[in-house]
A protein has these predicted regions:
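N-terminal glycine-rich anion-binding loops that anchor highly charged ligand groups
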Residues: 29-43
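C-terminal functional extensions of proteins
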Residues: 158, 168-209
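Short, basic, glycine/proline-bearing loop/turn elements
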Residues: 44-52, 107-109
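Conserved mixed alpha/beta catalytic, RNA-binding, or beta-rich assembly cores of soluble enzyme
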Residues: 78-152, 157-158, 166, 174
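Buried hydrophobic positions in well-ordered alpha/beta secondary-structure cores of metabolic enzymes
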Residues: 77, 160-162, 201
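A short, well-structured juxtamembrane/interface segment
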Residues: 52-67
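Charged, compositionally biased N-terminal leader segments and the immediate start
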Residues: 1-32
């Protein structure tokens, strides 16, 4: 079989990928300031639906960038999400990525309360005396608990990235966050998402600084 391959130098592969994305987006309207995030999600997934299903609260990107500049930590709901975030870039702003899912006390709390580790890890994060960006790519229960903590006045996130993937309570939990009036969010409406998408949104924000 003879297949014609595009001749691209290794250092230019990512650049060429973004050129293709821009070409294929054509006249698709993107909210001003969100283009780098949308394009990086498409680059990560090869899924152009993100041009339509990524929802941004007003000023979310600017607020997130300010939070990172001021040392906000990023809390993820998976080790995979944590692994995918550019920690060296984040460290330039005196910050770090945290994931409590494997912590022994989180496992004990989840077992004691008959809930998920994701719920317990969000509760642990809420006790931090820090500015927090939440990057949720896997667990709907994490997002539901964040919503409850916000409604109870126990948590004020700098940003919630709600891009978890799946079928059970995924759509519903995202809609809860979309209903919040005073919490900045970036949410992938519908079933699509994943820890890789959560990480790439964090990286897109970091690369915008």
């Amino acid at each position: 079989m003879k297949i014609e391959l595009e001749n691209v130098k290794p250092a230019e592969i990512e650049k060429r990928s973004f050129e293709i994305i821009t070409e294929e987006l054509g006249d698709t309207h993107l909210i001003p300031g969100t283009e780098p995030i949308v394009k990086r999600c498409i680059h990560t997934s090869a899924d152009f639906d993100y041009a339509k299903n990524l929802m941004f609260s007003e000023g979310a990107v600017e607020k997130a960038l300010d939070a990172i500049r001021n040392g906000a930590v990023i809390v993820t709901d998976t080790q995979m999400g944590k692994a995918g975030i550019n920690k060296r870039k984040l460290a330039e702003y005196g910050s770090e990525v945290l994931c409590f899912m494997s912590d022994e006390d989180v496992a004990e709390t989840a077992k004691k309360n008959g809930t998920t580790r994701a719920v317990a890890s969000m509760e642990k994060a809420a006790t931090l005396d820090k500015k927090i960006i939440f990057a949720i790519g896997n667990a709907p229960t994490a997002l539901v608990r964040l919503y409850e903590l916000i409604q109870d006045g126990k948590l004020t996130p700098e940003l919630i990235i709600g891009v978890h993937v799946g079928f059970v309570n995924v759509v519903q939990s995202k809609e809860l966050i979309l209903s919040l009036k005073d919490t900045p969010y970036i949410v992938a409406r519908g079933r699509k998402g994943g820890s890789n998408i959560a990480a790439c949104i964090c990286n897109a924000l970091l690369y915008m600084l």
